[in-house]
Amino acid sequence: MQVDLLSSAQSAHALHLFHKHSPLVHCMTNDVVQTFTANTLLALGASPAMVIETEEASQFAAIASALLINVGTLTQPRAQAMSAAVEQATRSQTPWTLDPVAVGALDYRRRFCVELLSHKPTAIRGNASEIMALAGVANGGRGVDTTDAAANAIPAAQTLARETGAIVVVTGEVDYVTDGHRIVGIHGGDPLMTKVVGTGCALSAVVAACCALPGDTLENIASACHWMKQAGERAVARSEGPGSFVPHFLDALWQLTQEVQA
């Protein structure tokens, strides 16, 4: 199994495209992470919108550059709104990304996410346990936490990518991005990133935005993982713990965009 690495030049090119196109991202995400997700997108140069009412969600999915479905705080009314948005995104050819939060631990959201797969997401982003559960390989995970190493989920990610046509991202100490054939590994980041709520969910929003960019979608998505890990490393070097990490992280994302424009 060959795992390719992303070059700095590829990452910088993708970030230049990101800043140039400034995708409008329709984030149907969980209640815990909305502000952090929006600020992450803004720091990188995208435009976030959190539209959740069923009628509006369907309408906005046709307007947005990309759609994110994150099931972290799933309810039946929210599931209805998400389904409507995904159906409209499919009709409008709006790329959409699925973040199957805790899908391995809870039956209702697992069934819902499996139903959504029939609408062919452009990308799927989850931890190892979530990706393996969604692929039907195993049930597991401790709520939103993974109990598996990311590398162990590569075969499941490849299967899921081939079955759905999505680019699948497995995040962990090393992130892996695959279209079912190619695999790109992204190293970096810091364990402190797991002590802040929302870093993975925010990454999913950035992945969604990258699906709207021209060029090689797999490389663009792998670049999103690289930016987040880079920013995490810079933020950890300047912070004293989780509380001071967040503002330094947002600053680091912003600085990355300024560097590629220089």
From Swiss-Prot:
Pfam families in the cross-refs: HK (PF02110)
One Gene Ontology term of the molecular function aspect: ATP binding
Binding site for substrate: M50, G198
Keyword Repeat recorded: no
UniProt KW keywords: ATP-binding, Kinase, Magnesium, Metal-binding, Nucleotide-binding, Thiamine biosynthesis, Transferase
Annotated EC: 2.7.1.50
Alphabetized InterPro entries for the sequence: Hyethyz_kinase, Ribokinase-like
Cofactor(s) this protein cannot do without: Mg(2+)
Gene3D superfamilies in the record: 3.40.1190.20
Pathway in which this enzyme or protein is active: Cofactor biosynthesis; thiamine diphosphate biosynthesis; 4-methyl-5-(2-phosphoethyl)-thiazole from 5-(2-hydroxyethyl)-4-methylthiazole: step 1/1
Catalyzed reactions: 5-(2-hydroxyethyl)-4-methylthiazole + ATP = 4-methyl-5-(2-phosphooxyethyl)-thiazole + ADP + H(+)
Top-level enzyme category: transferase
Residues annotated to bind ATP: R125, T171
Keyword Manganese applies: no
Family: Belongs to the Thz kinase family.
Protein name: Hydroxyethylthiazole kinase
